[in-house]
From Swiss-Prot:
Its EC number is 6.3.5.2. Heterodimer composed of a glutamine amidotransferase subunit (A) and a GMP-binding subunit (B). It comes from the Archaea. GO terms for cellular component: cytosol. This is GMP synthase [glutamine-hydrolyzing] subunit A. Keywords: ATP-binding, Glutamine amidotransferase, GMP biosynthesis, Ligase, Nucleotide-binding, Purine biosynthesis. Gene3D superfamilies: 3.40.50.880. It is an enzyme of class 6 (ligase). It catalyses: XMP + L-glutamine + ATP + H2O = GMP + L-glutamate + AMP + diphosphate + 2 H(+). NCBIfam families: guaA_Nterm, PRK00758.1. Residues 1-189 form the Glutamine amidotransferase type-1 domain. The lineage of its organism: Archaea, Methanobacteriati, Methanobacteriota, Methanomada group, Methanococci.
Amino acid sequence: MIVILNNGGQYVHRIQRSLKYLEVPAKIVPNSTTLEEIIADSEIKGIILSGGPDITKATNCENIALNSEIPVLGICLGHQLISKAYGGHVSRADSEEYASITIYVKEENDLFKGVPSKFTAWASHMDEVKVTPGCFEILAYSDICGVESIKHKEKSIYGVQFHPEVSHTEYGDVILKNFCKKCGFEFEE
């Protein structure tokens, strides 16, 4: 099972639905849920930190990002929280918008396996990661944001600024499936 921490974003139920389409069980929990409560359930194989409107109301997510031994994926605000937890810098975007953008994948990696080096995604850019922590590598960027996706260099911790769970994002299902594979789920190819 994947647990989705609800940071108040409008797409949190869409994340759960996208996982259901992949036949991956998932449940939504409040962002006040602790890592200890999550790992007490032996069925949980991965954590998704959802998007949301307010980074100051989701600080429990930082502890999860720092201490989880199971894979973590941060989406939008979740991505920013992961970066902030490890010492990255998050601030207002230069180009504040909610729109379709082109994502450029730097090189094939485990999160973007089977995804072309250039694809269209739906993204929110009110705030964004400006400086990536040293223990992370940048996986993807766009014309308006230099840090569209990150991965911890040693742990299975990922972040994406864009929304893979919405239909406007090409290959979003592939990206979510790749994360689920890191969590130990298997799929027929």
